[in-house]
Amino acid sequence: MAQLSKDDILEAVANMSVMDVVDLVKAMEEKFGVSAQAAIAVAGPVAGGEAAAAEEKTEFNVKMVSFGDNKIGVIKAIRTITGLGLKEAKDLVESVPSVVKESVSKEEAEKIKKELEEAGAKVELE
């Protein structure tokens, strides 16, 4: 069996679609029993800063709960917001509830929520 270098792996990941990378991350989480969120928790606030962070959240995840009656309009909005291709955007819309954008500022999250709701989707901020 040939050994793959880190560069070979990085190049392969760079050539994958966003949805394929998401699937890869999920598979790695399952295989190794880890979570991609663990790194975020480690880099989070330290002693005493946690109370302030709980009071004022600065990063939000935009979660689409439903695409409503205008599926095509929502797919177009997803493509504009995320830069995904048609197939990836369609897969994201059809897999609701799904996170559209992660760790965005409150202003950007509100803007994305407004765009998706105008297209007919039901959206939550987490």
Swiss-Prot record:
It comes from the Bacteria. SUPFAM superfamilies: ClpS-like, Ribosomal protein L7/12, oligomerisation (N-terminal) domain. GO terms for molecular function: mRNA binding; structural constituent of ribosome. Keywords: Ribonucleoprotein, Ribosomal protein. GO terms for cellular component: cytosolic large ribosomal subunit. PANTHER family: 39S RIBOSOMAL PROTEIN L12, LARGE RIBOSOMAL SUBUNIT PROTEIN BL12M. Homodimer. Part of the ribosomal stalk of the 50S ribosomal subunit. Forms a multimeric L10(L12)X complex, where L10 forms an elongated spine to which 2 to 4 L12 dimers bind in a sequential fashion. Binds GTP-bound translation factors. This is Large ribosomal subunit protein bL12. The lineage of its organism: Bacteria, Pseudomonadati, Pseudomonadota, Gammaproteobacteria, Legionellales.
